[in-house]
Swiss-Prot record:
GO annotation, biological process: cell division; cell wall organization; peptidoglycan biosynthetic process; regulation of cell shape; UDP-N-acetylgalactosamine biosynthetic process
EC category: transferase
InterPro entries, per the entry: Enolpyruvate_Tfrase_dom, Enolpyruvate_Tfrase_sf, MurA_subfamily, RNA3'P_cycl/enolpyr_Trfase_a/b, UDP_GlcNAc_COvinyl_MurA
Residue list for modification 2-(S-cysteinyl)pyruvic acid O-phosphothioketal: 116
UniProt subcellular location: Cytoplasm
Gene for this chain: murA2
GO (cellular component) term, any one: cytoplasm
Protein name (record): UDP-N-acetylglucosamine 1-carboxyvinyltransferase 2
Described purpose of this protein according to its UniProt entry: Cell wall formation. Adds enolpyruvyl to UDP-N-acetylglucosamine.
Amino acid sequence: MRKIIINGGKALSGEVAVSGAKNSVVALIPAIILADDIVILDGVPAISDVDSLIEIMELMGATVNYHGDTLEIDPRGVQDIPMPYGKINSLRASYYFYGSLLGRFGQAVVGLPGGCDLGPRPIDLHLKAFEAMGVEVSYEGENMNLSTNGQKIHGAHIYMDTVSVGATINTMVAATKAQGKTVIENAAREPEIIDVATLLNNMGAHIRGAGTDIITIQGVQKLHGTRHQVIPDRIEAGTYIALAAAIGKGVKITNVLYEHLESFIAKLEEMGVRMTVEEDAIFVEKQESLKAITIKTSPYPGFATDLQQPLTPLLLKADGRGTIIDTIYEKRINHVPELMRMGADISVIGGQIVYQGPSRLTGAQVKATDLRAGAALVTAGLMAEGKTEITNIEFILRGYASIIAKLTALGADIQLIED
Protein backbone atom coordinates (compact mmCIF):
# COMPACT_ATOMS: atom_id res chain seq x y z
CA MET A 1 0.00 0.00 0.00
CA ARG A 2 1.33 3.40 -0.98
CA LYS A 3 1.22 6.37 1.40
CA ILE A 4 2.11 10.04 1.41
CA ILE A 5 4.15 11.11 4.44
CA ILE A 6 4.33 14.82 5.29
CA ASN A 7 6.36 16.53 7.99
CA GLY A 8 4.46 19.78 8.24
CA GLY A 9 5.06 23.30 9.42
CA LYS A 10 7.59 24.30 6.76
CA ALA A 11 6.81 27.53 4.91
CA LEU A 12 6.85 27.06 1.14
CA SER A 13 8.33 29.36 -1.49
CA GLY A 14 9.25 29.32 -5.15
CA GLU A 15 7.39 28.64 -8.37
CA VAL A 16 5.02 25.87 -9.45
CA ALA A 17 3.63 25.30 -12.94
CA VAL A 18 0.06 24.14 -13.47
CA SER A 19 -0.40 21.10 -15.71
CA GLY A 20 -3.00 20.55 -18.41
CA ALA A 21 -6.61 20.25 -17.29
CA LYS A 22 -7.64 16.82 -16.04
CA ASN A 23 -11.32 17.57 -16.65
CA SER A 24 -10.51 18.44 -20.28
CA VAL A 25 -8.14 15.64 -21.14
CA VAL A 26 -10.45 12.89 -19.85
CA ALA A 27 -12.98 14.07 -22.47
CA LEU A 28 -10.49 14.95 -25.21
CA ILE A 29 -8.96 11.47 -25.38
CA PRO A 30 -12.25 9.60 -25.99
CA ALA A 31 -13.33 12.29 -28.49
CA ILE A 32 -10.32 11.44 -30.66
CA ILE A 33 -12.06 8.16 -31.59
CA LEU A 34 -14.16 10.26 -34.01
CA ALA A 35 -11.09 11.34 -36.02
CA ASP A 36 -10.10 9.81 -39.34
CA ASP A 37 -6.39 10.50 -38.80
CA ILE A 38 -3.76 11.08 -36.10
CA VAL A 39 -4.49 13.63 -33.35
CA ILE A 40 -1.78 15.08 -31.09
CA LEU A 41 -2.47 16.61 -27.68
CA ASP A 42 0.10 18.85 -25.97
CA GLY A 43 0.05 19.68 -22.27
CA VAL A 44 -1.31 16.29 -21.18
CA PRO A 45 -1.01 15.87 -17.39
CA ALA A 46 0.88 12.88 -15.97
CA ILE A 47 -2.01 11.46 -13.94
CA SER A 48 -3.34 7.94 -13.49
CA ASP A 49 -6.66 8.78 -15.19
CA VAL A 50 -4.71 9.47 -18.39
CA ASP A 51 -2.86 6.16 -18.02
CA SER A 52 -6.20 4.35 -17.68
CA LEU A 53 -7.65 6.08 -20.75
CA ILE A 54 -4.57 5.22 -22.81
CA GLU A 55 -4.88 1.58 -21.78
CA ILE A 56 -8.55 1.54 -22.82
CA MET A 57 -7.74 3.18 -26.17
CA GLU A 58 -5.01 0.62 -26.87
CA LEU A 59 -7.30 -2.28 -25.93
CA MET A 60 -9.81 -0.94 -28.44
CA GLY A 61 -7.19 -0.88 -31.20
CA ALA A 62 -5.81 2.67 -31.20
CA THR A 63 -2.08 3.29 -31.64
CA VAL A 64 -0.79 5.54 -28.85
CA ASN A 65 2.55 7.27 -28.29
CA TYR A 66 3.00 9.22 -25.05
CA HIS A 67 6.22 11.18 -24.43
CA GLY A 68 6.60 13.93 -21.85
CA ASP A 69 3.34 15.87 -21.97
CA THR A 70 2.62 15.07 -25.64
CA LEU A 71 0.12 12.36 -26.52
CA GLU A 72 -0.25 11.10 -30.10
CA ILE A 73 -3.24 8.91 -30.92
CA ASP A 74 -4.06 7.18 -34.19
CA PRO A 75 -7.70 6.06 -33.78
CA ARG A 76 -8.08 4.44 -37.19
CA GLY A 77 -7.63 0.94 -35.76
CA VAL A 78 -10.31 1.33 -33.07
CA GLN A 79 -12.79 -1.53 -33.23
CA ASP A 80 -16.40 -1.76 -32.17
CA ILE A 81 -15.87 -4.16 -29.24
CA PRO A 82 -17.22 -4.31 -25.67
CA MET A 83 -15.15 -2.03 -23.49
CA PRO A 84 -13.00 -3.49 -20.67
CA TYR A 85 -15.15 -3.51 -17.53
CA GLY A 86 -12.35 -3.26 -14.96
CA LYS A 87 -10.92 0.00 -16.25
CA ILE A 88 -14.34 1.45 -17.00
CA ASN A 89 -15.56 0.71 -13.47
CA SER A 90 -12.62 2.56 -11.92
CA LEU A 91 -12.93 5.68 -14.05
CA ARG A 92 -15.94 7.99 -13.89
CA ALA A 93 -14.95 9.89 -17.03
CA SER A 94 -15.17 6.64 -18.99
CA TYR A 95 -18.72 7.71 -19.86
CA TYR A 96 -17.19 10.02 -22.48
CA PHE A 97 -16.62 6.92 -24.59
CA TYR A 98 -20.41 6.64 -24.99
CA GLY A 99 -20.68 9.70 -27.19
CA SER A 100 -17.59 9.00 -29.28
CA LEU A 101 -18.47 5.34 -29.92
CA LEU A 102 -22.04 6.25 -30.85
CA GLY A 103 -20.74 8.94 -33.18
CA ARG A 104 -18.37 6.53 -34.92
CA PHE A 105 -20.15 3.17 -34.82
CA GLY A 106 -23.75 3.92 -33.85
CA GLN A 107 -23.46 1.56 -30.90
CA ALA A 108 -21.45 0.81 -27.76
CA VAL A 109 -21.26 -1.88 -25.09
CA VAL A 110 -19.80 -0.41 -21.91
CA GLY A 111 -19.57 -1.04 -18.19
CA LEU A 112 -21.10 1.51 -15.85
CA PRO A 113 -18.59 4.21 -14.80
CA GLY A 114 -16.83 4.43 -11.43
CA GLY A 115 -14.65 7.20 -9.93
CA CYS A 116 -15.17 9.19 -6.73
CA ASP A 117 -18.30 8.55 -4.66
CA LEU A 118 -19.75 12.03 -4.27
CA GLY A 119 -23.42 11.16 -4.12
CA PRO A 120 -26.02 11.27 -6.89
CA ARG A 121 -24.68 12.22 -10.30
CA PRO A 122 -26.55 9.81 -12.55
CA ILE A 123 -25.96 9.39 -16.24
CA ASP A 124 -29.68 9.78 -16.90
CA LEU A 125 -29.11 13.13 -18.62
CA HIS A 126 -26.63 11.51 -21.02
CA LEU A 127 -29.00 8.67 -21.84
CA LYS A 128 -32.00 10.98 -22.29
CA ALA A 129 -30.01 12.98 -24.85
CA PHE A 130 -28.86 9.85 -26.66
CA GLU A 131 -32.41 8.51 -26.82
CA ALA A 132 -33.54 11.78 -28.40
CA MET A 133 -30.87 11.14 -31.05
CA GLY A 134 -32.26 7.70 -31.89
CA VAL A 135 -30.30 5.50 -29.47
CA GLU A 136 -31.89 2.54 -27.67
CA VAL A 137 -30.55 1.76 -24.17
CA SER A 138 -30.62 -1.69 -22.56
CA TYR A 139 -28.79 -3.44 -19.73
CA GLU A 140 -27.19 -6.86 -19.45
CA GLY A 141 -25.49 -7.65 -16.14
CA GLU A 142 -22.95 -4.91 -15.41
CA ASN A 143 -22.95 -3.75 -19.03
CA MET A 144 -25.01 -1.10 -20.76
CA ASN A 145 -25.86 -1.53 -24.45
CA LEU A 146 -26.34 1.57 -26.59
CA SER A 147 -27.50 1.03 -30.16
CA THR A 148 -29.13 2.76 -33.13
CA ASN A 149 -29.97 -0.63 -34.70
CA GLY A 150 -27.81 0.01 -37.72
CA GLN A 151 -29.09 3.53 -38.32
CA LYS A 152 -26.99 6.69 -38.19
CA ILE A 153 -27.38 8.73 -35.02
CA HIS A 154 -29.46 11.81 -35.85
CA GLY A 155 -29.62 15.38 -34.60
CA ALA A 156 -32.16 16.52 -32.03
CA HIS A 157 -33.28 19.49 -29.95
CA ILE A 158 -32.25 18.66 -26.38
CA TYR A 159 -32.99 20.51 -23.15
CA MET A 160 -30.79 19.56 -20.20
CA ASP A 161 -33.01 19.31 -17.11
CA THR A 162 -29.95 20.00 -14.96
CA VAL A 163 -26.76 21.83 -15.87
CA SER A 164 -24.24 19.02 -16.39
CA VAL A 165 -20.70 19.25 -17.75
CA GLY A 166 -20.51 15.54 -18.53
CA ALA A 167 -23.85 15.35 -20.30
CA THR A 168 -23.15 18.52 -22.29
CA ILE A 169 -19.80 17.22 -23.54
CA ASN A 170 -21.10 13.72 -24.26
CA THR A 171 -24.05 15.03 -26.27
CA MET A 172 -21.83 17.47 -28.15
CA VAL A 173 -19.37 14.70 -29.05
CA ALA A 174 -22.11 12.30 -30.17
CA ALA A 175 -23.73 15.03 -32.28
CA THR A 176 -20.51 15.92 -34.10
CA LYS A 177 -20.96 13.14 -36.68
CA ALA A 178 -24.74 12.87 -36.39
CA GLN A 179 -27.06 13.33 -39.34
CA GLY A 180 -28.51 16.83 -39.16
CA LYS A 181 -28.44 19.56 -36.53
CA THR A 182 -28.40 19.20 -32.75
CA VAL A 183 -29.24 22.00 -30.33
CA ILE A 184 -28.37 21.69 -26.62
CA GLU A 185 -30.25 24.09 -24.35
CA ASN A 186 -29.36 24.75 -20.71
CA ALA A 187 -25.86 23.57 -21.57
CA ALA A 188 -23.04 23.80 -19.04
CA ARG A 189 -20.54 26.59 -19.73
CA GLU A 190 -17.29 25.35 -18.19
CA PRO A 191 -13.95 26.11 -19.92
CA GLU A 192 -13.42 22.39 -20.44
CA ILE A 193 -16.47 22.30 -22.72
CA ILE A 194 -14.93 25.06 -24.85
CA ASP A 195 -11.67 23.09 -24.93
CA VAL A 196 -13.38 19.95 -26.26
CA ALA A 197 -15.34 21.99 -28.82
CA THR A 198 -12.11 23.66 -29.95
CA LEU A 199 -10.49 20.27 -30.56
CA LEU A 200 -13.50 19.01 -32.49
CA ASN A 201 -13.78 22.19 -34.57
CA ASN A 202 -10.07 21.98 -35.39
CA MET A 203 -10.81 18.44 -36.64
CA GLY A 204 -13.52 19.80 -38.93
CA ALA A 205 -16.63 19.80 -36.72
CA HIS A 206 -19.26 22.55 -36.89
CA ILE A 207 -19.93 23.49 -33.25
CA ARG A 208 -21.11 26.94 -32.23
CA GLY A 209 -21.96 28.39 -28.83
CA ALA A 210 -19.67 26.34 -26.58
CA GLY A 211 -19.27 28.32 -23.36
CA THR A 212 -22.86 29.60 -23.57
CA ASP A 213 -26.07 27.90 -22.47
CA ILE A 214 -27.09 27.08 -26.07
CA ILE A 215 -24.78 24.95 -28.21
CA THR A 216 -25.52 24.16 -31.85
CA ILE A 217 -23.84 21.28 -33.69
CA GLN A 218 -24.23 20.62 -37.40
CA GLY A 219 -23.19 17.04 -38.04
CA VAL A 220 -20.36 16.27 -40.46
CA GLN A 221 -19.28 13.02 -42.13
CA LYS A 222 -15.53 13.18 -41.61
CA LEU A 223 -13.08 14.60 -39.08
CA HIS A 224 -9.39 14.99 -39.89
CA GLY A 225 -6.37 14.92 -37.62
CA THR A 226 -5.07 17.96 -35.76
CA ARG A 227 -2.78 19.17 -32.97
CA HIS A 228 -4.30 20.67 -29.83
CA GLN A 229 -2.99 22.38 -26.68
CA VAL A 230 -4.87 21.33 -23.54
CA ILE A 231 -5.96 24.29 -21.39
CA PRO A 232 -4.37 24.73 -17.93
CA ASP A 233 -6.07 22.94 -15.05
CA ARG A 234 -8.06 25.59 -13.17
CA ILE A 235 -8.71 23.20 -10.28
CA GLU A 236 -5.03 22.39 -9.84
CA ALA A 237 -4.29 26.12 -10.07
CA GLY A 238 -6.86 26.91 -7.38
CA THR A 239 -5.48 24.12 -5.19
CA TYR A 240 -1.95 25.54 -5.33
CA ILE A 241 -3.17 29.11 -4.82
CA ALA A 242 -5.04 28.07 -1.66
CA LEU A 243 -2.08 26.01 -0.50
CA ALA A 244 0.28 28.93 -1.07
CA ALA A 245 -1.98 31.23 0.95
CA ALA A 246 -2.16 28.67 3.75
CA ILE A 247 1.52 27.78 4.17
CA GLY A 248 3.53 29.90 1.72
CA LYS A 249 5.97 32.76 2.16
CA GLY A 250 5.87 33.83 -1.46
CA VAL A 251 4.75 31.35 -4.13
CA LYS A 252 4.23 31.99 -7.84
CA ILE A 253 1.75 29.75 -9.66
CA THR A 254 2.34 29.78 -13.44
CA ASN A 255 0.35 28.62 -16.48
CA VAL A 256 -2.82 30.08 -14.98
CA LEU A 257 -5.80 31.53 -16.86
CA TYR A 258 -7.25 34.13 -14.49
CA GLU A 259 -10.56 34.29 -16.35
CA HIS A 260 -11.20 30.64 -15.43
CA LEU A 261 -10.76 31.43 -11.71
CA GLU A 262 -12.52 34.75 -11.22
CA SER A 263 -15.12 33.54 -8.70
CA PHE A 264 -12.47 31.63 -6.73
CA ILE A 265 -10.11 34.61 -6.65
CA ALA A 266 -12.97 36.88 -5.57
CA LYS A 267 -13.64 34.70 -2.51
CA LEU A 268 -9.94 34.68 -1.60
CA GLU A 269 -9.90 38.47 -1.83
CA GLU A 270 -12.95 38.54 0.44
CA MET A 271 -10.90 36.56 2.96
CA GLY A 272 -8.09 39.10 2.71
CA VAL A 273 -5.61 36.95 0.80
CA ARG A 274 -2.85 39.11 -0.66
CA MET A 275 -1.82 38.19 -4.18
CA THR A 276 -0.80 39.71 -7.49
CA VAL A 277 -2.44 38.64 -10.74
CA GLU A 278 -0.03 38.61 -13.69
CA GLU A 279 -0.60 37.80 -17.36
CA ASP A 280 -0.42 34.02 -16.97
CA ALA A 281 0.54 33.65 -13.31
CA ILE A 282 -0.54 34.53 -9.79
CA PHE A 283 1.92 35.44 -7.03
CA VAL A 284 0.66 34.68 -3.53
CA GLU A 285 2.31 36.56 -0.68
CA LYS A 286 2.79 35.41 2.90
CA GLN A 287 -0.52 36.01 4.65
CA GLU A 288 -1.22 37.74 7.93
CA SER A 289 -4.81 37.82 9.24
CA LEU A 290 -7.62 36.23 7.23
CA LYS A 291 -11.39 36.56 7.61
CA ALA A 292 -13.83 33.63 7.71
CA ILE A 293 -16.29 33.56 4.81
CA THR A 294 -19.18 31.52 3.44
CA ILE A 295 -18.67 29.43 0.31
CA LYS A 296 -21.56 28.27 -1.88
CA THR A 297 -20.77 26.21 -4.96
CA SER A 298 -22.66 26.62 -8.22
CA PRO A 299 -22.19 25.81 -11.92
CA TYR A 300 -19.58 27.81 -13.84
CA PRO A 301 -18.94 30.73 -13.72
CA GLY A 302 -19.85 30.29 -10.04
CA PHE A 303 -17.59 28.83 -7.37
CA ALA A 304 -16.46 25.38 -8.54
CA THR A 305 -17.49 22.38 -6.46
CA ASP A 306 -14.06 20.88 -7.18
CA LEU A 307 -12.43 23.73 -5.25
CA GLN A 308 -14.43 23.73 -2.02
CA GLN A 309 -12.44 20.84 -0.49
CA PRO A 310 -8.96 22.13 -1.49
CA LEU A 311 -9.90 25.54 -0.04
CA THR A 312 -11.11 24.17 3.31
CA PRO A 313 -7.67 24.01 5.05
CA LEU A 314 -7.09 27.69 4.25
CA LEU A 315 -10.52 28.54 5.69
CA LEU A 316 -9.44 26.85 8.93
CA LYS A 317 -6.68 29.45 9.21
CA ALA A 318 -9.17 32.35 9.12
CA ASP A 319 -10.60 34.19 12.12
CA GLY A 320 -14.28 33.54 12.80
CA ARG A 321 -17.06 31.19 11.84
CA GLY A 322 -18.04 30.29 8.30
CA THR A 323 -19.99 27.76 6.25
CA ILE A 324 -19.49 25.76 3.07
CA ILE A 325 -22.57 24.81 1.06
CA ASP A 326 -22.11 22.46 -1.89
CA THR A 327 -25.16 22.64 -4.14
CA ILE A 328 -23.62 20.32 -6.75
CA TYR A 329 -22.47 17.21 -4.85
CA GLU A 330 -24.14 16.80 -1.48
CA LYS A 331 -21.77 14.07 -0.30
CA ARG A 332 -18.65 16.18 -0.81
CA ILE A 333 -18.07 16.23 2.95
CA ASN A 334 -15.84 13.20 3.46
CA HIS A 335 -12.79 15.35 4.20
CA VAL A 336 -14.45 16.76 7.31
CA PRO A 337 -13.92 13.81 9.70
CA GLU A 338 -10.33 13.47 8.47
CA LEU A 339 -9.63 17.14 9.23
CA MET A 340 -11.23 16.65 12.64
CA ARG A 341 -8.61 13.96 13.31
CA MET A 342 -6.03 16.69 12.81
CA GLY A 343 -7.70 18.99 15.34
CA ALA A 344 -9.84 21.11 13.04
CA ASP A 345 -12.91 22.80 14.54
CA ILE A 346 -15.20 21.73 11.72
CA SER A 347 -18.43 19.75 11.45
CA VAL A 348 -21.36 18.94 9.19
CA ILE A 349 -24.68 20.40 10.31
CA GLY A 350 -27.81 20.00 8.21
CA GLY A 351 -25.81 19.12 5.11
CA GLN A 352 -23.59 22.20 5.44
CA ILE A 353 -19.97 22.32 6.56
CA VAL A 354 -19.47 24.68 9.49
CA TYR A 355 -15.99 25.72 10.61
CA GLN A 356 -14.56 27.92 13.36
CA GLY A 357 -11.11 29.37 12.94
CA PRO A 358 -8.32 29.63 13.42
CA SER A 359 -7.73 25.91 14.03
CA ARG A 360 -4.33 24.60 15.05
CA LEU A 361 -3.71 21.43 13.07
CA THR A 362 -1.52 18.54 14.21
CA GLY A 363 -0.26 15.60 12.19
CA ALA A 364 -2.36 12.43 12.12
CA GLN A 365 -3.11 9.29 10.14
CA VAL A 366 -5.81 10.19 7.60
CA LYS A 367 -7.42 8.68 4.52
CA ALA A 368 -8.12 10.28 1.14
CA THR A 369 -11.73 9.38 0.36
CA ASP A 370 -11.84 11.09 -3.04
CA LEU A 371 -9.63 13.19 -5.30
CA ARG A 372 -10.29 16.69 -3.94
CA ALA A 373 -10.56 15.49 -0.33
CA GLY A 374 -7.08 14.08 -0.83
CA ALA A 375 -5.83 17.47 -2.01
CA ALA A 376 -7.31 19.06 1.13
CA LEU A 377 -5.46 16.57 3.33
CA VAL A 378 -2.15 17.28 1.59
CA THR A 379 -2.55 21.00 2.29
CA ALA A 380 -3.65 20.31 5.87
CA GLY A 381 -0.63 18.04 6.36
CA LEU A 382 1.70 20.79 5.15
CA MET A 383 0.07 23.23 7.60
CA ALA A 384 0.07 20.85 10.56
CA GLU A 385 2.67 20.45 13.26
CA GLY A 386 4.28 17.03 13.13
CA LYS A 387 3.87 14.05 10.83
CA THR A 388 0.82 13.33 8.68
CA GLU A 389 0.31 10.00 6.95
CA ILE A 390 -2.21 9.89 4.09
CA THR A 391 -3.47 6.56 2.78
CA ASN A 392 -5.70 5.74 -0.20
CA ILE A 393 -3.54 8.10 -2.23
CA GLU A 394 -4.56 6.61 -5.59
CA PHE A 395 -7.37 9.18 -5.56
CA ILE A 396 -4.83 12.01 -5.35
CA LEU A 397 -2.66 10.60 -8.14
CA ARG A 398 -5.75 10.43 -10.38
CA GLY A 399 -5.84 14.20 -10.72
CA TYR A 400 -2.64 15.96 -9.59
CA ALA A 401 0.33 15.56 -11.90
CA SER A 402 3.75 15.22 -10.23
CA ILE A 403 2.34 16.53 -6.96
CA ILE A 404 5.19 15.17 -4.81
CA ALA A 405 7.88 16.67 -7.06
CA LYS A 406 6.09 20.01 -7.33
CA LEU A 407 5.66 20.38 -3.57
CA THR A 408 9.21 19.20 -2.86
CA ALA A 409 10.50 21.92 -5.19
CA LEU A 410 8.62 24.48 -3.06
CA GLY A 411 10.38 23.23 0.07
CA ALA A 412 7.83 20.75 1.42
CA ASP A 413 8.98 17.72 3.40
CA ILE A 414 6.79 15.22 1.58
CA GLN A 415 7.37 11.77 0.15
CA LEU A 416 5.47 8.88 -1.38
CA ILE A 417 6.40 5.53 0.13
CA GLU A 418 5.55 1.90 -0.55
CA ASP A 419 4.42 0.21 2.66
